[in-house]
């Protein structure tokens, strides 16, 4: 018995490099094979039930030698996609990939019969096949299935990309994610890590006494964030609706209603730009806890993210884009001005307190301080924009930036000690915002006044300013306990945990322009 040299194994057809005419020819040939299968009877049988998966077999029998496998035969039934194939006269090898990994089939004419073996020679890479047989080791020691019964379950009509090059076109990876998942173990591992991270978050929240809830995706009034919404129409109610930009105001209504710890993991939609850090449809986790404040939230969020890293990656010390990222150490905490002076030490305290100086300085960065969003801009807003220009992108290590100005924090509780400042933080890691949280504003009259100021900004042309939500004000008028709330960007968090440079790498089906 011999085993194929893997370097010589028949490669999958290199779709990414094939001219359209060649690919069409391959597809036509495969359609002819499918037509022949239809004439023979059931072309897509659905009566095979696997008893094992590849990874579990390798884990359980990876160290079992051939004498032991012969002494106690292990019968298996396994199915998957044929990724490699080598026909050698009366015996052949095939590498089959299921949802857990790959395993080798050893197929002989004597075991499966003349007709099946002859048919197998014409099966194509990408076909879904099944086998029943026993485990054994080849001469080179590879754990394999000695096939006794072989079937074709699903005919693949399109050739797979070349095994050794995969999908070379990055956009094609996003557009045809199903192919990317077939040929790229790295992609599969990324989304497995995403699932582990989300499971960790849910488990952590449940252990801390939070109740998972679902709130509306269609809102009569967009709220909970400064963003431009997607607009749609509800035919039955004959009214304009908005895809939600954030669930915040509904979750806080639940706090008013007596659910003291709630969280939601779901989609938000913002009709804004696309970039390596932004996708119009993205996943957020928001959580709210009565009788807490932003300091408690920072501690809780830090532990939450650290544990998610451990559960998804096995460690809190990661490598991101070639640089170490240590989530095991205590996260830094800086005010906006402290962060500016850390990375741009030329600015003095006096300059950072001078609005005219800041406006002049921001113009050097190309900031239009006459834009509508600067209508109510105080010194805090100007400091924040300077922070964004000078410091934000340099916050590699996990850092909570605190003390955000009231005028850009319309839902946050004002500080009792520092005028114009709120009890708010944003968490930055690798120069990206990962989380945003604050002690919640529960003063109905103050909230109504802030909404009115937001409406003034919207009327002046600021598309991202908030609307006035009268029902939310009514809810606050019933009384909301002191509360802390936070939102974590799941996609950006998973980017860190999987060393992914682009947000579209961690979204299964990111938005792209239509092919036509």
From Swiss-Prot:
Binds 3 Mg(2+) ions per subunit. GO terms for cellular component: cytosol. InterPro entries: Aa-tRNA-synt_II, aa-tRNA-synth_II, aa-tRNA-synth_II/BPL/LPL, Lys-tRNA-ligase_II, Lys-tRNA-ligase_II_N, Lys-tRNA-synth_II_C, NA-bd_OB-fold, NA-bd_OB_tRNA. It holds the Pfam family tRNA_anti-codon. Gene3D superfamilies: Bira Bifunctional Protein, Domain 2, Nucleic acid-binding proteins. Transmembrane segments: none annotated. Mg(2+) 1 binds at residues 426, 433. Signal peptide: none annotated. Mg(2+) 2 binds at residue 433. GO terms for biological process: lysyl-tRNA aminoacylation. It comes from the Bacteria. It catalyses: tRNA(Lys) + L-lysine + ATP = L-lysyl-tRNA(Lys) + AMP + diphosphate. The keyword Protein biosynthesis applies. Homodimer. HAMAP family: Lys_tRNA_synth_class2. This is Lysine--tRNA ligase.
């Amino acid at each position: 018995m011999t085993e194929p040299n893997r370097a010589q194994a028949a490669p999958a057809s290199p779709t990414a490099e094939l001219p359209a005419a060649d690919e069409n020819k391959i597809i036509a040939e495969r359609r002819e094979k499918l037509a022949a299968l239809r004439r023979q009877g059931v072309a897509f049988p659905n009566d095979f039930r696997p008893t094992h998966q590849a990874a579990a077999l390798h884990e359980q029998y990876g160290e079992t030698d051939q004498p032991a496998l012969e002494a106690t035969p292990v019968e298996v039934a396994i199915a998957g996609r044929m990724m490699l194939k080598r026909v050698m006269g009366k015996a052949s090898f095939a590498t089959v990939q299921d949802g857990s990994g790959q395993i080798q089939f050893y197929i002989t004419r004597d075991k499966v019969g003349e007709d099946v073996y002859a048919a197998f020679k014409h099966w194509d890479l990408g076909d879904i096949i099944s086998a029943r047989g026993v485990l054994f080791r080849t001469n080179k020691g590879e754990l394999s299935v000695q096939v006794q019964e072989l079937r074709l379950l699903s005919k693949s009509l399109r050739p797979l990309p070349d095994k050794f090059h995969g999908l070379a076109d990055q956009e094609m990876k996003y557009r045809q994610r199903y192919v990317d998942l077939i040929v790229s173990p790295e992609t599969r591992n990324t989304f497995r890590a995403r699932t582990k991270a989300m499971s960790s978050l849910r488990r952590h929240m449940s252990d801390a006494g939070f109740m998972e809830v679902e709130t509306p995706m269609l809102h009569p009034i967009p709220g909970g964030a400064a963003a431009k919404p997607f607009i749609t129409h509800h035919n039955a109610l004959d009214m304009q609706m908005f895809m939600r930009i954030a669930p915040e105001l509904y979750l806080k209504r639940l706090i008013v209603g007596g659910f003291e710890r709630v969280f939601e993991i779901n989609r938000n939609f913002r009709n804004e730009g696309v970039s390596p850090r932004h996708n119009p449809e993205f996943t957020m986790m928001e959580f709210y806890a009565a009788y807490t404040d932003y300091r408690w939230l920072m501690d809780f969020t830090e532990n939450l993210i650290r544990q998610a890293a451990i559960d998804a990656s096995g460690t809190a010390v990661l490598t991101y884009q070639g640089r170490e990222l240590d989530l095991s150490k205590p996260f830094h905490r800086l005010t906006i001005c402290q962060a500016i002076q850390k990375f741009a030490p030329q600015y003095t305290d006096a300059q950072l307190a001078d609005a005219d100086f800041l406006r002049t300085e921001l113009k050097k960065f190309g900031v239009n301080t006459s834009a509508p969003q600067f209508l109510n801009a105080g010194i805090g807003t100007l400091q924040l924009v300077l922070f964004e220009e000078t410091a934000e992108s340099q916050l590699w290590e996990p850092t909570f930036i605190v003390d955000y100005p009231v005028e850009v924090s319309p839902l946050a509780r004002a500080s009792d000690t520092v005028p114009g400042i709120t009890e708010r933080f944003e968490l930055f890691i690798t120069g990206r915002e990962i989380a945003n949280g604050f002690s919640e504003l529960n003063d109905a009259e103050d909230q109504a006044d802030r909404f009115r100021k937001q409406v003034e900004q919207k009327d002046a042309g600021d598309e991202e300013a908030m609307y006035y939500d009268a029902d939310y004000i009514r809810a606050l008028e019933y009384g909301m306990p002191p509360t802390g709330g936070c939102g974590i960007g799941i996609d950006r968090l998973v980017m860190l945990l999987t060393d992914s440079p682009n947000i579209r790498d961690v979204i299964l089906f990111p938005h792209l322009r239509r092919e036509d």
